[in-house]
From Swiss-Prot:
Key word Transmembrane helix present: no
Gene transcribed to yield this protein: rpsO
Function: One of the primary rRNA binding proteins, it binds directly to 16S rRNA where it helps nucleate assembly of the platform of the 30S subunit by binding and bridging several RNA helices of the 16S rRNA. Forms an intersubunit bridge (bridge B4) with the 23S rRNA of the 50S subunit in the ribosome.
Subunit structure: Part of the 30S ribosomal subunit. Forms a bridge to the 50S subunit in the 70S ribosome, contacting the 23S rRNA.
Tree of life domain: Bacteria
The name this protein goes by in its record: Small ribosomal subunit protein uS15
Highest classification ranks of the organism: Bacteria, Pseudomonadati, Pseudomonadota, Gammaproteobacteria, Alteromonadales
Cell membrane found in the keyword field: no
Length: 89
């Protein structure tokens, strides 16, 4: 359940600091959020797909850790990212 190349490029353009910025915390969180949203739609149709659900939980955990790191190191960027993504924090 990966994202298309176009979707990734759009996220990189919106949240990246440069053209090839794939490693910044904001980009990683935005990519994880897009994948999580995609999987949530998948589970509306495939309720009993427990293998993918485990992957979803890993993504949510990774996003939570990245957000905690960003909040601890740069609170202003954290708040901007939360607002852009529409996360409940």
């Amino acid at each position: 359940m990966s994202l298309s190349t176009e979707a990734k490029a759009k996220i990189l353009a919106e949240f990246g600091r440069g053209a090839n910025d794939t490693g910044s915390t904001e980009v990683q969180v935005a990519l994880l959020t897009a994948q999580i949203n995609h999987l949530q739609d998948h589970f509306k149709e495939h309720i009993h797909d427990h293998h993918s659900r485990r992957g979803l939980l890993r993504m949510v955990s990774a996003r939570r850790k990245l957000l905690a790191y960003l909040k601890r190191t740069e609170a202003v960027r954290y708040n901007e990212l939360i607002q852009k993504l529409g996360l409940r924090r």
